[in-house]
């Protein structure tokens, strides 16, 4: 989906503005940009290149984005039903993710949840784990510390998280909002807070 790729590319372009000077990303290294400042840091690499994702992950992201952009949460049902397993949407078992999202949403329609999905997917991502535990996770904040964010990373955090929650998260140093995980084989594993 060109829209999702453009959304991700646009978000990546915002990250490359540093100290008031525009710095164009190098396409050969953009996928390996990292928030880790020190060599040897175990912080996962932050990635922005949609095209660097495995094809099954891209397909799942496109399906999620298309359903979310519709504004109709029921359009997410075929995406959920086509998935190999029901993605985790809460720490406790949930039979019907759509009903759960409607119940948890501000207006009962789930549109704010769909918006959160799109916001999360517009940020950078990280690849975590290895083998059967490998996962692509959005936003990268879910897997990195928040205590040493650059100004551009703080702006990206504010785009994903309501400001009052972002401030509290920065104080604690831990991300505590929506995160989305897809395995390399395209199986959507979670979208939860």
What is the predicted function of each stretch?
Residues 2-12:
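Core hydrophobic alpha-helical transmembrane segments of single-pass membrane proteins
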Residues 1-3, 47, 66:
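Short, flexible active-site loop motifs that bind/organize anionic cofactors or intermediates
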Residues 10-62, 77-193:
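C-terminal-biased regions
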Residues 64-76:
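Short helix-adjacent coil turns
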